[in-house]
Amino acid sequence: YENVKYNAQLIKPGLTFREFAEKAWRLPENCFDNHYPCQIHGVGMSDEWPFIPYPDKDYSNGDYSGIFEENMVICVESYIGEVDAYEGAKLEDQYLVKKNGLEKLSSLSLDLT
């Protein structure tokens, strides 16, 4: 929940995908090799554009040249689970990028308190 919330607050029109990837919440080292393929994706059948992967050390594993734009609909996603563990948590919220930030479109709260 914390990483979805943290990553969502970074996004605004004009932010590049590379800037987002550099500032995004970092997965714990013992979970990194088990991460979901992307941190951000568009809406569709399966991880549509924009597709922002968890970056490798030199950012060679994806195209980070895009820019967040007003009226873009995105999903902020996370999976955290240790490698070889039986359990983990996969969370996702959908947002509309607006002039002054994001409007949450998903209605289910991820807060367990």
Q: What does each of the following model-derived ranges do?
A:
Residues Y1-T113:
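Active-site neighborhoods and metal-handling regions in enzymes and metal-associated proteins
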